[in-house]
UniProtKB/Swiss-Prot annotation:
One of its GO terms (biological process) is nucleotide metabolic process. The keyword Cytoplasm applies. CDD domains: Maf. It catalyses: a ribonucleoside 5'-triphosphate + H2O = a ribonucleoside 5'-phosphate + diphosphate + H(+); a 2'-deoxyribonucleoside 5'-triphosphate + H2O = a 2'-deoxyribonucleoside 5'-phosphate + diphosphate + H(+). The keyword tRNA-binding does not apply. It comes from Nitrobacter hamburgensis (strain DSM 10229 / NCIMB 13809 / X14). This is Nucleoside triphosphate pyrophosphatase. GO terms for cellular component: cytoplasm. InterPro entries: ITPase-like_fam, Maf-like. Keywords: Cytoplasm, Hydrolase, Nucleotide metabolism. It holds the Pfam family Maf.
Amino acid sequence: MAVWREPKPLILASQSRVRQALLANAGLSFEAIPAAIDERAIQRSCGLTSGAEIAVRLACEKARYVSLRSPGRYVIGADQTLECDGRLFNKPDGRVGAAEHLRALSGRTHALHAAVAIVRDGRQLFEYVSVARMTMRELSEDTIEAYLNAAGDEVTASVGAYQLENLGVHLFSRVEGDHFSILGLPLLPLLAFLRSQGLLSL
């Protein structure tokens, strides 16, 4: 059952299969159009140092980029950032980078910020950011090697080199935060906003 009331579907400015699945499972009609932006260049030039603020900025920029090329459409942008011991992590560069990420996060608690924004005709209508506290268990070199062998290259698409919805769940001893946000999309606040605008039938 589709609950989206507008004649034209939403646009998700992301190629993330997990975010697409979350929207589809919630009954939202949408199409995915990834934003062709340089995330690291924006991050360097924006002058922001907080992981939460950077996540919001990137979510907004993704949505704005696609919105300006899609008149009249509601566009969702989303982003995640990870902070651990004062260090801001980017998506790992290949398997070697993923292993380095996991070594740095092993035995520590990190903050995972998930942001979502909605833009229409270049105008930002909504933004939200949440934080989850993720405690990774102590990982041996053998465990890291075995995990990367089993999980494959897909882990490099995640800022923390793990996917909690898959084998990444084995890496953690404690997780505190909203499940949807950890997967990459603060879904409940997003749905609440769309509902408040009369855009959903439920």
